[in-house]
Amino acid sequence: MSDVKKAVLAYSGGLDTSVILKWLQDTYQCEVVTFTADLGQGEELEPARQKALKFGIKPDNIFIDDLREEFVRDFVFPMFRCNTVYEGEYLLGTSIARPLIAKRQIEIARATGADAVSHGATGKGNDQVRFELGYYALMPGVKVIAPWREWDLLSREKLLAYAEKHGIPIEMKHKQGGSPYSMDANLLHISFEGRHLENPAAEAEESMWRWTVSPEAAPDAAEYLDLEFERGDLVAINGTRMKAHELLAKLNELGGKHGIGRLDLVENRYVGMKSRGCYETPGGTILLRAHRAIESVTLDREVAHLKDDLMPRYASLIYNGYWWSPERRALQALIDNTQESVNGWVRVKLYKGNVIVTGRDSKTDSLFDPTIATFEDDQGAYNQKDAHGFIRLNALRMRIAANAQTKRG
């Protein structure tokens, strides 16, 4: 293989990346650095360190980093400033995590003198694109090793056989032959793919869901939350200020209890195929609804409509892996500028899978003027006669077109 001296592997400690670790050592005969990111996935990460040590990885070459605050503060919250949704439904929980992982991998590569990076994404999915676009944007000359595009371990059986041959621990769920869901989790969401979900007509099993109760099993009593925003970002829940990752974790807890945030969809992958996935995004679902509500009283109409026009493009950039692109950065600068006035509070009611906005206001930036909007006597604040000329001017082009149509017969 090509001359690789040291490679930084995005390492979860699971079967796939453990096989990759051994394969890198055998195939490239290079030194391997492992990097495990804590993005709030709720798993114990120390076992990844112990597994890496068993593969002969030097202690100084094992990185387990708590990235929860950076993830929410610098990636999730900026994305939600745009009310970002891909294809009308998906809140991009997996997509938004990949640029941070790529960033940290490159930082570690520079710090350790590595000349290569590696990941465990398959050649069929979006993640290979997301990781590698990030690598090249941040370290143009880096060597990228994508084992799923190189090796011949193209079935679960071959992967298990390789693991057994090389003494790689195999979790009981794999030994029992049941093909588990392919899952990805972080503070924003948990996703499920595979098994019977590959039939888009089949309903997901209730036992699959991890973070949320079913709406039918949710409490019969609604729960109200007051959410405070500053410059478009959530800063407090019910008057209690917390760090960004703590806020999202709290919303996940509250939303999950009320059956909020389940999603079952078929999406268009960047590589060209359609795939079916199920997602739980309780906190993100609450955050999206509340953010739109505070914008409704603080954003100028045309600015709000411009954001809505740009959002699908922004969402596609994130979904397709272009977080580090100049066009995403340019859009972010515009979006962030619009958020200077997005300050205030929103009250939501959580009830059996629903997020219902019941109030919103801003003491400093509200554009809602009750003296003009009232249905009662406005004491001359708005002259209704002004509407006559406004309507006639806006109808002019349609009147001209209608007259022309009449002449044509």
Curated annotation (Swiss-Prot):
Keyword Amino-acid biosynthesis appears in the UniProt entry: yes
UniProt catalytic activity: L-citrulline + L-aspartate + ATP = 2-(N(omega)-L-arginino)succinate + AMP + diphosphate + H(+)
Principal place of residence: cytoplasm
A biological process term (GO) from this entry: urea cycle
Gene Ontology terms for molecular function: argininosuccinate synthase activity; ATP binding
Compartment(s): Cytoplasm
Pfam families the UniProt entry points to: Arginosuc_syn_C, Arginosuc_synth
EC number: 6.3.4.5
GO CC annotation, single: cytoplasm
Keywords for the protein's UniProt record, in alphabetical order: Amino-acid biosynthesis, Arginine biosynthesis, ATP-binding, Cytoplasm, Ligase, Nucleotide-binding
Binding site for ATP: 10-18, 37, 120
Annotated InterPro entries: Arginosuc_syn_C (IPR048268), Arginosuc_syn_N (IPR048267), Arginosuc_synth (IPR001518), Arginosuc_synth_CS (IPR018223), Arginosuc_synth_type_1_subfam (IPR023434), AS_cat/multimer_dom_body (IPR024074), Rossmann-like_a/b/a_fold (IPR014729)
Residues binding L-aspartate, per UniProt: 122, 126-127
Annotated metabolic or biological route of this protein: Amino-acid biosynthesis; L-arginine biosynthesis; L-arginine from L-ornithine and carbamoyl phosphate: step 2/3
Amino-acid positions noted as binding L-citrulline in the UniProt annotation, renumbered to this chain: 90, 95, 126, 130, 182, 191, 267, 279
Subunit structure: Homotetramer.
UniProt similarity note: Belongs to the argininosuccinate synthase family. Type 1 subfamily.
Protein name: Argininosuccinate synthase
Organism: Aromatoleum aromaticum (strain DSM 19018 / LMG 30748 / EbN1) (Azoarcus sp. (strain EbN1))
Lineage: Bacteria, Pseudomonadati, Pseudomonadota, Betaproteobacteria, Rhodocyclales
Gene name, Swiss-Prot/TrEMBL: argG
